[in-house]
């Protein structure tokens, strides 16, 4: 058992029951080079429909009109504020696989002053930070974002914040930490 599994509040289920869960283990291992800790700790204990819900979030993300980099910036910002180590790790893993600008993701904590971020991105990230941290948004923060984004894009940003919280709270609530997916992604490149 590796260290990420040893720290979880519930023990990882290494040998799942049921065909659907065995398939979930196989396909996550195939995609990531390992069975993800949330699958072994959380999904394995619930009916398959719960796991499919998480998959549906990913499918819905593909329907977003926001640039893919912005989608990952929003998700990373939420995970960073909530301190979801697993979510930060898997998000960065996806950005590495997609050959996105890693310096920009490294500078996310300083987005307000970093030259790597546009005013448009700063406006969205301010909104995301306020909503995530305070569970409330000042009208002026919303207005600043609304100058840069369409109504649909604003709703997409809200969707990203809300759906990222589902992932974050699942992992934080079970003390699930990084699976070192960034390291695996770098080795694949």
Identify the residue ranges that each predicted region occupies.
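Mobile cap/lid helix-loop segments that border enzyme active or cofactor-binding sites
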Residues: 1-68, 96, 189
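Iron-sulfur (Fe-S) cluster-binding segments and ferredoxin-like electron-carrier domains
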Residues: 46-49, 88-107
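Short acidic alpha-helix initiation/capping motifs at coil-to-helix transition points
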Residues: 48-53, 83-87, 131-139, 161
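Short, thiol/selenol-centered motifs that function as redox-active sites or metal-ligating centers
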Residues: 71-92, 164
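Short alpha-helical scaffolding segments that buttress acidic/His motifs in well-ordered protein cores
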Residues: 73-78, 108, 124-132, 157-168
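Acidic/His metal-coordination segments adjacent to aromatic residues that form catalytic metal sites
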Residues: 108-119
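Acidic/histidine-rich alpha-helical segments that form the ligand environment
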Residues: 119-159
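Preference for long, well-ordered alpha-helical segments
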Residues: 151-188
């Amino acid at each position: 058992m590796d260290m990420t599994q040893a720290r979880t509040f519930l023990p990882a289920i290494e040998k799942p029951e049921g065909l659907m869960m065995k398939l979930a283990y196989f396909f996550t291992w195939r995609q990531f080079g390992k069975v993800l800790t949330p699958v072994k700790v959380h999904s394995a204990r619930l009916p398959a429909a719960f796991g499919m819900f998480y998959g549906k979030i990913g499918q819905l993300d593909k329907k977003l009109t926001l640039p893919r980099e912005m989608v990952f910036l929003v998700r990373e910002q939420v995970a960073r504020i909530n301190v979801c180590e697993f979510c930060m790790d898997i998000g960065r893993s996806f950005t590495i696989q997609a050959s996105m600008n890693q310096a920009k993701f490294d500078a996310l904590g300083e987005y307000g002053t970093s030259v790597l971020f546009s005013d448009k991105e700063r406006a969205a990230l301010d909104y995301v930070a306020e909503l995530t941290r305070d569970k409330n948004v000042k009208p002026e923060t919303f207005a600043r974002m609304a100058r840069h984004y369409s109504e649909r894009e604003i709703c997409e940003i809200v969707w990203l914040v809300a759906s990222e919280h589902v992932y974050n709270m699942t992992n934080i609530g079970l003390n699930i930490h990084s699976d070192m997916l960034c390291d695996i992604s770098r080795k694949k490149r």
